[in-house]
Amino acid sequence: MTPAAFKRSIRDLQVWCSSCMVALSGSDPIGVLIGAKRPSGTLVHKIAVHPAHRRQGHARHLLASLSSKLAILGPPRIIAEVPETLASACELFRASGYVQEALLTDYVFSSPGDFVPPTPSDASASAKAAADLAGRFVIPVTVDDLAANGLLGETHPQVWMRSVETLTARKDDIAGLAVASDERIEAHLLYVKPGIGLEGSAEAGPPASPLPVEIVSLRTFVEDDGDRLKQLLSRLGAQGMEPFRFPKVHPAEISKELLETLGFRPAGVHRLYAARARSDSSSFQS
């Protein structure tokens, strides 16, 4: 993590210095924990120990110290979103008393330009879908637009990096599209503007190869088998923004079946671990 990325995480994720810790061996730093804190809880954003000092209990001590502090200062809920591929990190949280609450799936849409919606079983179904979208418009939207219409509420579980607080903090980095009728917004898609990432900035210059467009919100408010979301994805793909990446999707946020209908496929998993802070540093309460 670079100094610039750390500064951005303070703004975007609400990293608190009081929730950050360093383990020392003499005067040498050998471990670090970076925590982000909101009224709902604390996220263990980063935890790492120098390779020469692993398997000596330093990481567990950092977690226990954070727990003891939060037992006094609050909030008591502590979470971590750990890549499933990091087996040692998953074991660390399990051994420290954390309980797995959910699997968060990374989805990719590798070729929006080649996307072809599933063919309806008969002509009447195709005609119904076309009629349902008649009189609707695809319009640009912002985070502020959705907030003003009450469409950014915490109606379902969201991961830290795509929570309302993060979207609001990053609103200048985020653009969006929506399907709207004369009366309301019926579906929307928010994405990070190309060239900007959570741990980078537009000033850093373009990458050596195109990066996936990161989707940070994908919602429909109409039962239409995903037709409105397909329209938004097709519009975004037509603008040359591809491929798409939709990270850390909670199973209660949007169904796997709908995402597969839209053309997404799973590409990775994070484990969501949680515990409650306790002043007794030797154990956690799930």
Where are each of the predicted segments found?
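Active-site-proximal cofactor/substrate-binding loop regions of enzyme domains
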Residues: 1-66
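Conserved acetyl-CoA binding element of GNAT-fold acetyltransferases
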Residues: 40-52, 198-224
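Amide-forming acyltransferase catalytic core, primarily the GNAT-like/NAT-type
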Residues: 1-3, 95-209
